[in-house]
Design a protein with these regions (language model features):
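Intrinsically disordered, low-complexity regulatory segments
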Residues: 1-6, 16-17, 23, 171-201
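Cysteine-based protein phosphatase catalytic domain of the PTP/DSP
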Residues: 7-106, 124-159, 165-167
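Short cysteine clusters
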Residues: 111
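Glycine-rich nucleophile elbow surrounding the catalytic serine of serine-hydrolase chemistry
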Residues: 115-120
């Protein structure tokens, strides 16, 4: 594994602050010692809420026992490349509003690798916060270079439906989205392969 490949792999569980209230990352390590080290990093970073988007796993018990002050929100979903529902995005937006109503939150939004589901939900939250369609993509990719944001189209669709916005505006914003992805392609298959590869390889 080259130094560049090791750097790509290292993004998996790295905390990636996007704004002062939003951070994205991958999931906790499987071994207890590694997971506790990460949780301490989350606490040091001021994380108040964790939004876990993995259908395949839950860390609710781990967070409850080792970081009870952190609010854990489980919104597990698939990562099969198909569409994500409006209801799933709406649930994430409800968490955002709930956290803000409770004080001054710092949300950690994550899935397994922090490539698609987590960044896509974070994108939905940025749109809800008033960010421009393309500027939100830019800030996510700058914060986390392995963020592919595969469900961005679904996030945009859910945003327009949630707020009853003009369908013509959706078409225009969707085209801006497509143009950005065309100009900012990343090799997702390579990133996934490197993350799955043993560290000693």
């Amino acid at each position: 594994m080259t130094s560049d490949e090791r750097e790509l792999r290292a993004w998996h569980r790295r905390l990636c602050p996007v704004t002062d209230w939003l951070t994205i990352s991958g999931d906790l390590q499987n071994d207890e010692e590694g997971a506790l080290t990460q949780i301490r990093e989350w606490q040091s970073a001021g994380i108040t809420d964790v939004v876990d988007l993995r259908q395949e796993w839950s860390d609710e018990d781990v967070i409850y026992h080792h970081a009870p002050a952190i609010h854990y929100h489980y919104l597990g979903t698939h990562d099969n490349g198909g569409a994500q529902s409006d209801a799933w995005f709406d649930a994430g937006i409800a968490v955002l509003h709930e956290a803000r109503a409770a004080g001054d939150p710092r949300l950690l939004v994550h899935c397994h690798m922090g490539i698609n589901r987590g960044p896509s939900m974070a994108y939905a939250m940025l749109l809800e916060d008033g960010w421009d369609v393309v500027e939100a993509l830019e800030v996510l990719r700058q914060a986390r270079p392995i963020a592919a944001i595969a469900y961005a189209r679904d996030a945009l669709r859910a945003h327009y439906r949630r707020h009853g916005l003009d369908p013509a505006g959706f078409a225009a914003d969707l085209e801006r989205q497509r143009a950005w992805f065309s100009d900012n392609h990343i090799d997702v298959a390579k990133v996934i392969r490197l993350i799955r590869q043993p560290a000693s390889a």
